[in-house]
A protein has these predicted regions:
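A domain-level signal for the structural core that forms small-molecule/cofactor-binding pockets
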Residues: 2-254
């Protein structure tokens, strides 16, 4: 099996080339660099938990997969792992590249799932809770798995938009499908739902196991992280907040 040759292109002064995107393929610049240049030109971030789908052109995800595979093969070689003679690791570089780009971190490279929003024709204004939603991510420090549960509380008003139950899970999966820090991920989920639904109140609670604690480091198998985001009426009304948290805790016990 052959792998693409990765050619770094530099300008005469040693800095990264900034030629127009149309010329990059001819110059042999890696697709990751082309994408990075578009993001920088738009003055946007590309942190680990940012979505960069708007800057990836048709066909470039396949190119990116090939580039990550080639670079991952270099990592395996640096770890002194024989990928030629060992049939168990012969395809590991490609498997890992596919896992990151198409599964674990696909929330970085895919656009936001389509979500149909419905008007609140019945003028619903009572507490709604969705959960537990199983969520999976990876910490951006060690790329170790994060696995947990998410609960979402919504206090709609007559002007709020409503979404289907499955869409809460799809949006959460999209946000969590990137290298994340849990407290930031929960805020991103809350921001997304707040923008789409415009409720009077929004609450998000997440409890998760972090493999960077159980699989490495202190190797504590029992620790969990729990954090919450409260917006609007959940922040202002202590009784509503207590009701939401009590119902979530009852569901945990059940």
């Amino acid at each position: 099996m052959t792998y693409p040759r990765i050619i770094a292109h530099e300008s005469p002064n040693g800095s990264d080339a900034t030629a127009p995107a149309a010329d990059h393929d001819e110059l042999g610049v890696p697709v990751s660099q082309r994408i990075r240049e578009r993001i920088k030109a738009a003055q946007r971030r590309f942190h680990a938990n940012d979505n960069i789908a708007d800057f990836i052109r048709e066909g470039e995800r396949d190119e990116l997969l090939a580039e990550v595979e080639a670079r991952m093969r270099g990592v395996l070689q640096a770890l002194v792992i024989d990928t030629e003679s060992d049939h168990n690791t012969h395809e590991t570089a490609r498997r890992v590249a596919k896992m990151y780009l198409k599964e674990v971190f696909k929330g970085r490279y895919e656009r936001q799932p389509e979500v149909t929003e419905f008007p609140n024709v019945e003028h619903l204004n009572e507490l709604m809770i969705v959960g537990p939603i199983t969520v999976r991510s990876a910490c951006s420090h060690h790329f170790c798995p994060i696995v947990g549960k998410l609960w979402i509380g919504v206090m709609p008003n007559e002007h709020s938009n409503l979404i289907g139950l499955s869409k809460y899970a799809r949006l959460a999966e999209w946000v969590m499908g990137r290298p994340q820090i849990q407290e930031v991920a929960v805020t991103q989920v809350a921001d997304l739902l707040q923008t789409k639904m415009q409720p009077d109140g929004l609450a998000v609670v997440m409890e998760a196991e972090h493999f960077c604690m159980s699989w490495r480091g202190v190797r504590d198998m029992d620790s969990r992280m729990i954090n919450s985001v409260m917006r609007g009426s959940f922040l202002k009304d202590a009784n509503l907040r207590r009701e939401f948290l009590a119902l979530v805790n009852d569901r945990k016990k059940g």
